[in-house]
From Swiss-Prot:
Glycans are attached at residues 138, 196, 397, 449, 540, 779, 816, 931, 1002. It holds the Pfam family I-set. Residues 1-18 form the signal peptide. InterPro entries: FN3_dom, FN3_sf, Ig-like_dom, Ig-like_dom_sf, Ig-like_fold, Ig_I-set, Ig_sub, Ig_sub2. One of its GO terms (cellular component) is extracellular region. Interacts with PTPRG. It comes from Homo sapiens (Human). The gene is CNTN5. Disulfide bonds join 123-173, 217-269, 322-369, 411-458, 503-551, 593-650. Expressed in brain and kidney and at very low level in placenta. Not expressed in other tissues. In brain, it is highly expressed in the occipital lobe, amygdala, cerebral cortex, frontal lobe, thalamus and temporal lobe. Expressed at moderate level in the cerebellum, substantia nigra, putamen, medulla and hippocampus. Weakly expressed in the spinal cord and caudate nucleus. Weakly or not expressed in the corpus callosum. This is Contactin-5. Gene3D superfamilies: Immunoglobulins.
Length: 1100
């Protein structure tokens, strides 16, 4: 465990260093870039799926299952035969099983210039016994003792100071325990490096202007892939690729299709390793122009093209290059012969590179690139072939077989090219033998024996990869045993009954079965037979069949026997009464079940209703089972319900047989709900309904009732019908006296002599047809309004009685004593008032008014005629004798006399007020209602002059304002609190004294003082007023009193003094000079002080 922990810590640290180095682009690569582990599942290149076995808590989130010991041949026995259950096998570490891969080694690319000098190839398996590990390189086992650089920690193979010459190659992990061995996928160890360019000076390349040129990179030795770029003159001025210049990532060369004077200079090839990020620069290659003239135009010459055959793995990205020299600069185009270039393809580098991401099988085909200019064209064709790694379609399952049985295993994989198959046994290639055949992924072994047990692997491979599937073969070989299939020692049956005595011994090979009765072998006949599974069957058992029966199982490894006694009894008979009974809901009944049986057998009674057992505890006390005698039982059914109707069963069970009988119980009750209610026809006040009959519950239906519900009704209401009485044989009727244009639901209720049943399901909601309104408004009256207005009010008609759309009101009125009516339309159905204004109408003129209704169907009735008066005028006189009196610092009393004569009766008065420095139009107002003749204005500012006016108002408006009056609020009360409080308690009273309060210039004069006192815990204080600087406060009740003093003036009460707490005490004398208890605030010592004050002391 310690070594495993160290390895995990080592790998974690190196991974952290890796991520850190990647975040610092300017630094050389550390171990972070050294190991590039290629993720690959076992279904991809070299992948191998581990066999599902069972879930191990030590493996974290590893998902696996128990062994699938599925039989693949004849005479298969379930794994339960060996392990009792698969769950038990998971937990039982005493069961041996072969190795199962948890982790297989991954491909590694190791940088040769790494500071970290170790390579770790991981391998982890589980099995029982715990497997051991060996490693192979290029198919040969590695001797760990042969090189000090090798070490093995658990299954992880570690190479210190790895060397490309010694250590590169293909590695496999071989895991072995006593069950067998399995071989892992091949993991490739590759070394990443980048050599230096040769230091030789490169010759200058001299061309004519307009000529094409190729500058060779000639990269140094490297592994794996490298990326090419070119520097022009000096770093970091890189050559920009365009339609004229191209850098091939296949050759590394720089191609210039048409040289210009601006191209003259020095060129340096820069290569970068894709793993280590190391970079090296080539010696410069000078490019010069010849002085023998400009190159003439010529047709394209393709210098860079993709191979004749391009191979790519499915799902990867394919890049095909094509670039040409020429003058003028050629244009590159692409096409797919006999097809279309995939829509996902992209053209890069001025169309010199065709890139196909996520390549699929249907992307394969012949591709052509074409270079063309004004002088001609040239083209190249090559074929793209897409291959796929092998992928499992069907894998192996662990299997157990009896010795001598045939084995057939088949594994199937897909891939392109089509995979071929090889088989391994315990990590070693399996060869055909006399009993062993291998054909196209099928392994067959005839007559398996113990030597065939072990671990098998199917290897599917094509030229691009290989995958492994593993399975364990167990060969069973054991003597017969009845340990898991014991027989009953005594089998009891009744006469003429069929008997099957089982005999199922466990053993491998499968045991042969023989039977004896007593000491004589059982002879088969028409009535007695040995079944294929070894059981003994006896038809029409009789007393002569009684006795001891012996079953014997035997194979090459031994034999075993088991004995059972057969006893034949008389058959049981049963009688259930009464057989058929009719009851009414609420009645009770007793069913009696009597059994005639063999006296040696005990009987048990079971009751059922409609084939289901009766639950006596859950049936609400309706059922009770009564067992008065050993051979009979009663079922009491109390207060029977409709749901209790049906067939009741009584079953009698003995150890030998089981018999049953049934009785039918019919229950009469109120009818069931009628069927679906359908509205056949609808008018403005009727609805014709039909329904399917209700179940009569064994009592004929006498009548039906129709019920309706609308948004305006209180629940369901019985409606009038035609015919008035709906007899039980009817299935339709008409509901009448419905309101027009109202949505209704209907339901039907059935009644029989026993009672009324449940209602039917409501019908769909339906609206009656429209009709002319029939209901006139009520409570027509007048309302107060403004001068020259006639206000007519009424109670709106409910939507239930509007009878259709477009509902409104017709308001008719005329001066009292005249003949012609004036009518006005009010279109709102919710309106309750109409105002008619006429400047010629004097106040309080009587009018006759009536209000009618209408809708889209026509006009309805008018209400009764009532007489109302037009609005009175607004008050015409102003209040008189208005006075304003200051009450306090924030209050002023404004009073006035009522108006004696006015054209309009006042409903109240409005008082307007504003400060002396403000305008009247900014005045605030306060309204009174009724006959009040004064108001106290509050919330005013102290020592401030205010102006006031008063005017009357009613529904017609406001009257003229009164004359303006003024008043000044009183000064603020003193802000200084009484100080230097002195007190003396004697008995049940306290004498207080304090210093006088001197008001400030803007404060009102002190009139006197108020002493507030209350018992602690009470909210209401009592007050003593005095003009003196002392007062006597009574303390009538026991307890602590809280006292404070305030000065008061015409401006109100001033600031309170600090509170004092005084206990009521009948003896002794306490003064403020002798007490430290001056304030209401308490501390942890307050209780102690209070107790001290309650102790008499003559020294006080």
């Amino acid at each position: 465990m310690a070594s495993s922990w160290k390895l995990m810590l080592f790998l974690s640290v190196t991974m952290c260093l890796s991520e850190y180095s990647k975040s610092l682009p300017g630094l050389s690569t550390s171990y972070a870039a050294l190991l590039r582990i290629k993720k690959s599942s076992s279904s991809s290149l070299f992948g191998s799926k581990t066999r599902p076995r069972y879930s191990s808590p030590s493996l974290g989130t590893l998902s696996a299952s128990s062994p699938s010991w599925l039989g693949a041949a004849q005479n298969y026995y379930s794994p339960i035969n060996l392990y009792h259950s698969s769950d038990a096998f998971k937990q039982d570490e005493s069961v041996d099983y072969g190795p199962v891969f948890v982790q297989e080694p991954d491909d590694i690319i190791f940088p040769t210039d790494s500071d970290e000098k170790k390579v770790a190839l991981n391998c982890e398996v589980r099995g029982n016994p715990v497997p051991s590990y060996r490693w192979l390189r290029n198919g040969t086992e590695i001797d760990l003792e042969s090189d000090y650089r090798y070490s093995l920690i658990d299954g992880t193979f570690i190479i210190s100071n790895p060397s490309e010459a010694k250590d590169s190659g293909h590695y496999q992990c071989l895991a072995t325990n006593t069950v067998g061995s399995i071989l892992s996928r091949e993991a490739t160890l590759q070394f990443a490096y980048l050599g230096n360019f040769s230091g030789r000076t490169r010759s200058a390349v001299s061309v004519r202007e307009g000529q094409g040129v190729v500058l060779m990179c000639s990269p140094p030795p490297h592994s794996p892939e490298i990326i090419y770029s070119w520097v022009f003159n000096e770093f970091p001025s890189f050559v920009a690729e365009d339609s004229r210049r191209f850098i091939s990532q296949e050759t590394g060369n720089l191609y210039i299709s048409k040289v210009q004077t601006s191209d003259v200079g020095s060129y340096i090839c820069l290569v970068k390793n894709t793993v280590t990020n190391a970079r090296v620069l080539s010696p410069p290659t000078p490019l010069t122009l010849r002085n023998d003239g400009v190159m003439g135009e010529y047709e394209p010459k393709i210098e860079v093209h993709f191979p004749f055959t391009v191979t790519a793995a499915k799902g990867t990205t394919v890049k095909m290059e094509c670039f040409a020299l020429g003058n003028p600069v050629p244009t590159i185009t692409w096409m797919k012969v006999n097809g279309y270039i995939p829509s996902k393809a992209r053209l890069r580098k001025s169309q010199a590179v065709l890139e196909i991401p996520n390549v699929q099988l249907d992307d394969a085909g012949i591709y052509e690139c074409r270079a063309e200019n004004s002088r001609g064209k040239n083209s190249f064709r090559g074929q793209l072939q897409v291959y796929t790694y092998p992928h499992w379609v069907e894998k192996l399952n662990d299997t157990q077989l009896d010795s001598g049985s045939p084995l057939r295993w088949e594994c199937k994989a897909t891939g392109k090219p089509r995979p071929t198959y090889r088989w391994l046994k315990n990590g070693v290639p399996l060869s055909p033998q006399s009993r062993v055949e291998m054909v196209n992924g099928v392994l067959m072994i005839h007559n398996v024996n113990q030597s065939d047990a072990g671990m098998y692997q199917c290897l599917a491979e094509n030229k691009y990869g290989a995958i492994y599937a593993s399975a364990e073969l167990k060969i069973l070989a054991s003597a017969p045993t009845f340990a898991l299939n014991q027989l009953k020692k005594t089998i009891i049956v009744t006469k003429d009954q069929e008997v099957v005595i089982e005999c199922k011994p466990q053993g491998s090979p499968k045991p042969t079965i023989s039977w004896k009765k007593g000491d004589r072998a059982v002879r088969e006949n028409k009535r007695i037979a040995i079944l294929p599974d070894g059981s003994l069957r006896i038809l029409n058992a009789s007393k002569s069949d009684e006795g001891k029966y012996v079953c014997r199982g035997e194979n090459v490894f031994g034999s075993a026997e088991i004995i059972a006694s057969l006893s034949v009894k008389e058959p049981t008979r049963i009688e259930l009464t009464p057989k058929r009974t009719e009851l009414t809901v609420g009645e009770s009944i007793v069913l009696n079940c009597k059994a005639i049986h063999d006296a040696s057998l005990d009987v048990t009674f079971y009751w059922t209703l409609k084939g289901q057992p009766i639950d006596f505890e859950e049936e609400g006390g309706h059922f009770e089972s009564i067992r008065a005698q050993a051979s009979s039982a009663d079922l009491m059914i109390r207060n029977i319900l409709l749901m209790h109707a049906g067939r009741y069963g009584c079953r009698v069970q003995t150890t030998a047989d089981s018999v049953s009988d049934e009785a039918e119980l019919l229950v009469r009750g109120p009818p069931g709900p009628p069927g679906i209610v359908i509205v056949e026809e609808i008018t403005e006040s009727t609805a014709t309904l039909s329904w399917s009959p209700a179940a009569d519950n064994h009592s004929p239906i006498s009548s039906y009732n129709l019920q309706a519900r609308s948004p305006f009704s209180l629940g369901w209401q019985t409606v009038k019908t035609v015919p008035e009485i709906i007899t039980g044989d009817m299935e339709s009727a008409m509901a009448v006296d419905l309101n027009p244009w109202v949505e209704y639901e209907f339901r039907v209720v059935a009644t029989n002599p026993i009672g009324t049943g449940d209602p039917s399901t409501p019908s769909r909601m339906i609206r009656t047809n429209e009709a002319v309104p029939k209901t006139a408004p009520t409570n027509v009256s007048g309302r107060s309004g403004r001068r020259h207005e006639l206000v007519i009010a009424w109670e709106p008609v409910s939507e239930e009685f509007q009878n259709g759309e477009g509902f409104g009101y017709i308001v008719a009125f005329r001066p009292n004593g005249t003949r012609g009516w004036k009518e006005k339309m009010v279109t709102s159905s919710e309106a309750s008032k109409f105002i008619y204004r006429d400047e010629s109408v004097p106040p309080l003129t009587p009018f006759e008014v009536k209000v009618g209704v209408y809708n889209n169907k026509g006009d309805g009735p008018f209400s009764q005629i009532v007489v109302i008066c037009s609005a009175e005028g607004e008050p015409s006189a102003a209040p008189t004798d208005v006075k304003a009196t200051s009450v306090s610092v924030s209050e002023i009393l404004v009073a006035w006399k009522h108006i004696k004569e006015s054209l309009g009766r006042p409903q109240g008065f409005e008082v307007g007020y504003w400060k002396d420095m403000e305008q009247e139009d900014t005045a605030e107002t306060v309204k009174t209602r009724g006959n009040e003749s004064f108001v106290i204005l509050t919330g005013l500012e102290g020592n401030t002059l205010y102006h006031f006016t008063v005017r009357a108002y009613n529904g017609a408006g406001y009257g003229p304002p009164s004359s303006e009056v003024s008043a000044t609020t009183k000064k603020s009360p003193p802000s200084q609190a009484p100080s230097n409080l002195r007190w003396e308690q004697q008995g049940s009273q306290v004498s207080l004294g304090w210093e006088p309060v001197i008001p400030l210039a803007n404060e009102s004069e002190v009139v006197g003082y108020k002493v507030f006192y209350r018992q602690e815990g009470h909210s209401n204080s009592q007050v003593i007023e005095t003009q003196k600087l002392q007062a006597v406060v009574p303390l009538p009740d026991a307890g602590v009193y809280i006292i404070e003093v305030r000065a008061y003036s015409e401006g109100g009460d001033g600031t309170a003094s600090s509170q004092i707490r005084v206990p009521s005490y009948s003896g002794g004398k306490i003064t403020s000079a002798q007490s430290t208890l001056h304030s209401l605030s308490t501390s942890s010592s307050s209780v102690t002080l209070l107790l001290a004050l309650m102790i008499p002391s003559t020294s006080w």
